[in-house]
């Protein structure tokens, strides 16, 4: 299966954090569809493996917070997870929305934007990374994704998928993120707000590394980060932050 060609988007960019999560249930197909419709440059989502080897799009290690069921994702089969309602806790109008698999996301949206994939657990012998690579090749999106994670994920990426883009989160809660990004040969790093300043951004850019920020929902805050050189901002408030990025892209006042 081959995705349509995706033209590179200019920087600065807006990354829809778990989709358009301010308006829709996070990490669901409606949330991603809304982000596509609004014109997000990238979607960020999280992956956990199920007990029977499916790559499930969900942030937490358990179903408890975002669905009407309980249980640890890694200890449950996909059929059990698919039976959980991932919409109703966000609002009655979302009843019936389910947590998708990675394949479901790419069936719907491959070729429409880039994907920032936060791998929470690389799996035994890098299973998650190896399957992610296999699916990316199947859906023709290898050049439309990058994988974010801490040290165990970065090490598995270097071992099992060195050709795929990496985004370093290791050192995010400190001042050594850029050094870790260089160590893991990453094309991107993702700063946390409190440890992001112009000097760190310049250091990353000097090393040829693209800089993400996690996160900004306030338009004025987003504008300040764009002004000091951040390349991409993760946000839950897509409708509010997207116009700020477009002003920065085209030099509008």
Regions found by a protein language model. Name each.
Residues 1-253:
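Phosphate-group recognition and catalysis centered on beta-loop-alpha active-site segments
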């Amino acid at each position: 299966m081959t995705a349509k060609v995706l033209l590179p988007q200019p920087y600065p960019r807006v990354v829809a954090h778990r989709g358009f999560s301010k308006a829709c249930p996070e990490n669901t197909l409606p949330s991603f569809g809304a982000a596509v419709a609004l014109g997000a440059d990238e979607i960020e989502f999280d992956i956990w493996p199920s007990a029977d080897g499916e790559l499930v799009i969900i942030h937490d290690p358990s179903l408890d917070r975002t669905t009407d069921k309980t249980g640890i994702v890694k200890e449950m089969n996909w059929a059990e997870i698919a039976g959980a309602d991932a919409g109703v806790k966000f609002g009655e109008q979302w009843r019936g929305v389910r947590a998708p698999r990675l394949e479901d996301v790419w069936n719907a949206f491959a070729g429409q934007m880039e994907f920032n994939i936060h791998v929470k657990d690389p799996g035994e012998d890098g299973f998650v990374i190896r399957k992610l690579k296999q699916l990316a090749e199947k859906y023709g999106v290898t050049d439309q994704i990058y994988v974010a994670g801490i040290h165990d994920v970065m090490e598995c990426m270097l071992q099992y998928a060195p050709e795929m883009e990496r985004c370093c989160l290791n050192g995010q809660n400190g001042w050594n993120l850029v050094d870790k990004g260089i160590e893991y040969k990453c094309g991107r790093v993702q700063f946390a707000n409190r440890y992001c300043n112009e000097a760190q951004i310049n250091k990353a850019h000097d090393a040829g590394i693209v800089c993400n920020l996690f996160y900004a929902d306030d338009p004025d805050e987003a504008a300040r980060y764009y002004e000091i050189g951040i390349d991409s901002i993760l946000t839950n408030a897509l409708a509010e932050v997207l116009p700020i990025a477009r002003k920065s892209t085209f030099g509008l006042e």
